[in-house]
């Protein structure tokens, strides 16, 4: 085997020991597995701390299945393949194997994993006729069965890497030459040497191409420089096996030398994915990132890099196996097993042991023995097996077919992701559907230069032409030159003519002033999307909390927006004329159309297309407008399309992009305004709220300039777009920072300082996609070069919004439907609010006036006074109220009356009565009107009076809780006249002698007693249940002597109230 070391002489003598002398007695039902692996050094993928838990899991499954090795017990014995320094040894491993063979006579050996340890042990086991299983020893030489007759490899092998590279070359059309570079580590198991050996031998065998190879030493910059010169002379397709840091350093030097992805491709042979931090590692995987100040260059260099790793299984059995493996490793082996591609090695040992047990079981069933190593080994070869690592296929040479993955960098995010998978069994390359190989030129570079590495192609060396060819060439060039010069002269003349014509000029007299309110009246009762018809957000300014909107006017019959320019005069220099020409040349549906300009002092102004739906800022801040994500993405796409046109045109950049400069027209199309014409822009005030509020969208590098360019920069526009994107996503205002209430001045100062991390608005991943948040962060990156251009932003938005149609009509109809739905919701909301207010007003009206009277007034009818033949009126007051009021504060008196009348109002709700009024401590109630109830009015009032009296006895005065409130009640029955009096604060009043008499009954009564007139007593006697007591004749003012009664109660009925 190339690169393998010679076995020492004393080990050769051990091979001569007769196998029979090594056999020791044991139990017939015991099957011994001898393990020879590193026992202390856990850095090896096949260390015992990693493989031991897998072996125990495999033996556990054997015990759980009665069909495997019935009647047999599997036991393990251990031997170390390490030397005293903890490194794999070609001496320690064979000695351990001999000791295990002599003492335990094992039926099978498990391991070693290191190549130099496995080589002598593999030769011994072939001599002893004992099978050897390993998921390591991946070198090409271990596959030579003349020496390793009974070795079966259930893990990856490097010759299979050559199969993957062969398929890759065939797919990409590389049929001539490749270069292989590797860092050889002589002190250990030389992993890169054996990786390159397998690739080199298999590719040369299968493709018959030239494969050059070069060894190098890691950490030597001079050596790296010489290595890159070799790359320039011998390769365009380069395979490099080294540590991740060395590969990154090489890529940086390659970038400096001009070896970029247009002409070169570098494959990192990183089979265990160390540069990717493990296949299950953190996302995104960025092997170029180190935070050492070189990341930006490294990311650029890695556009020419791809990474080759083993393919990690993703079947459910493997994922469940990993959980059990980690738990057992931690619990029993005191080892914390991390995620990564190294875990496929213990999984392959697990599957290999199960495959061996299956082969032994079959051998025993056919009359064989566990010591028949050749028969058992042949049963494992050329066989398929379903294990935890998925579909396991051992070929006819005893090597497992290995799957590989190819990783490539996403140019937008810089993260590496799998783009191709190789199936080792079918020898097929399978593309990952959502990812594609990235090539800077759109296609892979050729494996040899166009003219060869040494410019040896004859087609590139024709250094002379015939006379006729020279004349033809000169004549053609002369003609083309003449046509080009003529074309440019014509263009120059047309341009001068257009500049002189001043087609943009507008006379102030041609403008007909018009307020937006008048325009809306002439257009009918149209509603705008923002709900504010007078708003033209593209030209608004803010001063404190007040908004001043641009004026409008009619020009040639069309309504236009008029922006006044705060300048005394505009000098029409050639620069200004070109600015005006460029504005007239703008024709894009996502940019407001430039109508013209007036430069006549003092009426200097700019006329642009008027958009009636308002600005994006107004729409976002109006909480009554519902915007789903389809609508938001549509508005965002409109901004991107407009900015793409600006950046690719003569204007070049906006310089003042913000949500208030994005307006919505009548067709719900968002348009960008206030672009170009930097000579017309108002000089900024030195300080004030307005200045800082305007700068919330400005990029930090422009804020730090003493005199930033009026046109801004393209990277600055991307930053402004990122701020707008956050406004659209959160709808919480411009530069919203959760938990902080900062003024615009404070925000601008923190952004300008350049804090680490940079001070930026908040994001809420619950309200938008994580990818959208990443796009925001890229747009407002501190380094302008890290911000994506609008072309990349457009592609990213397409990924977020795949389900929405790109058809203009479909988008317009969707916006119209969204707008209609929003209007329906708004009308429904306003209707419900109106009905609620109407209900409250009616409830208040019914408390002031009787229900029937209130209904008449609501219908607009005049309430006529009405006479009632018989009603019962109740009067009450508080005895000693005047003295009590004098001894109390006004607030205490108000509280007392409020508590008392609240109690009374709750009681009278249980009776057919109407409360007429309260005056001070006087309380007046009537029954029998406005709805007549026959003779029931006397009974209702009598019962109510008893209930009120009962309530008063338990009533407590807040500021005099020990004092009893003394209520005096008078009741009288008779005719009255009732009606509504007055137009302002109308009141329902009662008139007639009955009212006066009832009042006299109350004033001549006694505290805590109910005083009745004889008329009321006569009506109550009809109900036969009230207890009355004659009081006698009482002298009343204006009435003379009147016979009255006391109401004591009602028989057979508890007092209500």
Swiss-Prot record:
Subcellular location(s) of the protein: Membrane
Similarity comment text for this entry: Belongs to the adenylyl cyclase class-4/guanylyl cyclase family.
Domain of life per record: Eukaryota
Catalytic reaction annotation: GTP = 3',5'-cyclic GMP + diphosphate
Gene Ontology MF terms: ATP binding; GTP binding; guanylate cyclase activity; natriuretic peptide receptor activity; peptide hormone binding; protein kinase activity
Disruption phenotype: Npr1-deletion mice exhibit weight loss, elevated blood pressure, and postnatal death. They display systemic hypertension associated with cardiac hypertrophy and ventricular enlargement. In addition, a composition change of immune cells in the spleen can be observed.
CDD domains: CHD, PBP1_NPR_A, PK_GC-A_B
Top-level taxonomy: Eukaryota, Metazoa, Chordata, Craniata, Vertebrata
Leading EC class: lyase
Transmembrane annotation, as ranges: 470-490
Species whose genome carries this gene: Mus musculus
UniProt EC number: 4.6.1.2
PANTHER family linked to this entry: ATRIAL NATRIURETIC PEPTIDE RECEPTOR 1, GUANYLYL CYCLASE
Name this polypeptide is given: Atrial natriuretic peptide receptor 1
Keywords: cGMP biosynthesis, Chloride, Disulfide bond, Glycoprotein, GTP-binding, Lyase, Membrane, Nucleotide-binding, Phosphoprotein, Receptor, Signal, Transmembrane, Transmembrane helix, Vasoactive
GO biological process: one example: receptor guanylyl cyclase signaling pathway
Assembly behavior: Homodimer.
Cystine pairs: 88-114, 192-241, 451-460
Binding annotation for chloride: 81, 113-114
Domain Protein kinase: from-to ranges: 524-801
Residue stretches making up the Guanylate cyclase domain: 872-1002
Post-translational modification: Phosphorylation of the protein kinase-like domain is required for full activation by ANP.
